[in-house]
């Protein structure tokens, strides 16, 4: 059977379901594919097809994730759902599935639970920019309160909503402005719609995603950045650095900065080549060589980045969210303690750093996730949301993300 051609006509947006165990994340994921396929076309995916998620490896870490897709009238959504809490932690920290927005599923009968809080915190730490709330199991709440629209039902909904908005505020999301949609994922999955809690609520959710989550900026439209992988000296022409353009475009004749490890310097791009052909620009996703005017071979090194001037700065101290690989994943067999000094691998290079653990935490076990403050021995070009690996002698023992830059 021939593969279907991928439609590039609609903007592509990455979302995912987060929330406490058994609040209905997977049911909602299945309901979204069903409702969208019936209303706007596409394929429905059954609950079982999402629930037994295949395991995949991201940087040596085993993560079970389900990927589904669905369409709204204006967009194509790629949606991730994870079976277990540990999978969410790993997924969000490694950036295996980066989200432009998250759908927080919270049971109306239970209200916010420990993982509800933890997933909101993780979203803040790893830089998920927007959250939309689906208040699930509203049909069960209605049964308990003598029906939809009764005073008791409205009061209970309002209470849970208030709790959720406060929780979102705590983690610096705009609680008051966050859309909260009550409904029943199970009803929608079964094609029912009593009191508009089923298919109507899920349709409303998709319309809300369309309105509330802005279209992500494409890599090519962002400011130029290229991690340096190699440096060559070409007699008579000067210094060439090679790497894969991470974002943006570099044009011949433009001024660029060399950032990281040493003091930031400015230079000019005097040539771009790819496969030994000269080009007038290098674009996001391309592996190129960039010729630098007046830069000596020993003034640039692997681990630095080329960037549009003023768009990225070098830092040494940052707060991070880290997942420590378990023994089974090839990680450490023993815990580590404060004063731990591994290598932090950013983009193309390792830099040694010292770890400061949160107050009251004495040790970190393999398989844990933890917030820690890192002080590097050399500055690295970084911004919040940058991913890194933690290594000991070339072996990966953890994965992390820059949550907040300190200096």
UniProtKB/Swiss-Prot annotation:
Its EC number is 3.6.5.3. Residues 81-84 are annotated as: G3. GO terms for cellular component: cytosol. Residues 184-186 are annotated as: G5. Residues 60-64 are annotated as: G2. It is an enzyme of class 3 (hydrolase). It is found in: Cytoplasm. GTP binds at residues 19-26, 81-85, 136-139. InterPro entries: EF-Tu_GTP-bd, EF-Tu_GTPase, EFTu-like_2, EFTU_2, G_TR_CS, P-loop_NTPase, Small_GTP-bd, T_Tr_GTP-bd_dom. It comes from the Bacteria. Residues 10-217 form the tr-type G domain. Keywords: Cytoplasm, Elongation factor, GTP-binding, Hydrolase, Magnesium, Metal-binding, Nucleotide-binding, Protein biosynthesis. It catalyses: GTP + H2O = GDP + phosphate + H(+). Mg(2+) binds at residue 26. Monomer. Belongs to the TRAFAC class translation factor GTPase superfamily. Classic translation factor GTPase family. EF-Tu/EF-1A subfamily. PANTHER family: ELONGATION FACTOR TU, MITOCHONDRIAL, ELONGATION FACTOR TU-RELATED. GTP hydrolase that promotes the GTP-dependent binding of aminoacyl-tRNA to the A-site of ribosomes during protein biosynthesis. This is Elongation factor Tu. It comes from Teredinibacter turnerae (strain ATCC 39867 / T7901). The lineage of its organism: Bacteria, Pseudomonadati, Pseudomonadota, Gammaproteobacteria, Cellvibrionales. The gene is tuf.
């Amino acid at each position: 059977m021939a593969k279907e051609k991928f439609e590039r006509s609609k903007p592509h947006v990455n979302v995912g379901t987060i929330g406490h165990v058994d609040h209905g994340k997977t049911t909602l994921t299945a309901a979204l594919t069903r409702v969208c396929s019936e209303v706007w076309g596409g394929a429905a995916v059954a609950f079982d097809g999402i629930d037994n998620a295949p395991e995949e490896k991201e940087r040596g870490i085993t993560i079970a994730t389900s990927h589904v897709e669905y369409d709204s009238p204006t967009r194509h959504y790629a949606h991730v759902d994870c079976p277990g809490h540990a999978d969410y932690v790993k997924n969000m920290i490694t950036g295996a599935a980066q989200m432009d927005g998250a759908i927080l599923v919270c049971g109306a009968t239970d209200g916010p639970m420990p993982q509800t809080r933890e997933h909101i915190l993780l979203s803040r730490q790893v830089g998920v920019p927007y959250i939309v709330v689906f208040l699930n199991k509203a049909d069960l709440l209605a049964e308990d309160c003598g029906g939809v629209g009764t005073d008791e039902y409205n009061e209970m909904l309002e209470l849970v909503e208030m709790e959720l908005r406060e929780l979102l505020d705590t983690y610096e999301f705009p609680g008051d402005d966050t859309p909260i949609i009550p409904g029943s994922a199970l009803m929608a999955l079964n094609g029912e719609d009593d009191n508009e809690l089923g298919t109507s609520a899920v349709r409303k959710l998709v319309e809300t995603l369309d309105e509330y989550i802005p279209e992500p900026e494409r890599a090519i439209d962002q400011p130029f950045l290229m991690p340096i992988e190699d440096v060559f000296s070409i007699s008579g022409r000067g210094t060439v650095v090679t790497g894969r353009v991470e974002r943006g475009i570099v044009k011949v004749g433009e001024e660029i900065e060399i950032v990281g490890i040493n003091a930031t310097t400015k230079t000019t791009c005097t040539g771009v080549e790819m496969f030994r052909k000269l080009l007038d620009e290098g674009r996001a996703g391309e592996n190129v060589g960039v010729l630098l005017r007046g830069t000596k071979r020993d003034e640039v090194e692997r681990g630095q980045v080329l960037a549009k001037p003023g768009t990225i700065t070098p830092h040494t101290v940052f707060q991070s969210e880290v997942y420590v690989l378990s023994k089974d994943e090839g990680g450490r067999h023993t815990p580590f303690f404060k004063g731990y000094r591994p290598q932090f691998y950013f983009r193309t290079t390792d830099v040694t750093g010292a770890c400061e653990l949160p107050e009251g935490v004495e040790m970190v076990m393999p398989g844990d996730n933890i917030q820690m403050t890192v002080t590097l021995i050399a500055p690295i070009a970084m911004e919040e949301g940058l991913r890194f690996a933690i290594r000991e002698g070339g072996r990966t023992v953890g994965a992390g993300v820059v949550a907040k830059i300190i200096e």
